[in-house]
């Protein structure tokens, strides 16, 4: 269920500012989005897994806060990010 090192490296290569970038908001949002997608698929099969559902809600809230920060700092970066990730906003 957790992201493998290869998956993280691939995501960070696409969305990070440089190869070893793990701290930029874009990289963090991209990693959170992948984790949210994986958890959503898990919960489609395991509908009664309430602990994972709570974890999903926490991840969504964290991603929302990071996106809010990016929107406040630079609207162009925010729009580019949500377009590349395919998020509805």
UniProtKB/Swiss-Prot annotation:
Lineage summary: Bacteria, Bacillati, Actinomycetota, Actinomycetes, Mycobacteriales
Subunit structure: Part of the 30S ribosomal subunit. Forms a bridge to the 50S subunit in the 70S ribosome, contacting the 23S rRNA.
Pfam families the UniProt entry points to: Ribosomal_S15
The protein's name: Small ribosomal subunit protein uS15
Residue ranges the record marks as coiled coil: none
Record PANTHER family: RIBOSOMAL PROTEIN S15, BACTERIAL AND ORGANELLAR, SMALL RIBOSOMAL SUBUNIT PROTEIN US15M
Provenance organism: Mycolicibacterium smegmatis (strain ATCC 700084 / mc(2)155)
Tagged with keyword Amino-acid biosynthesis: no
MF term (GO), any: structural constituent of ribosome
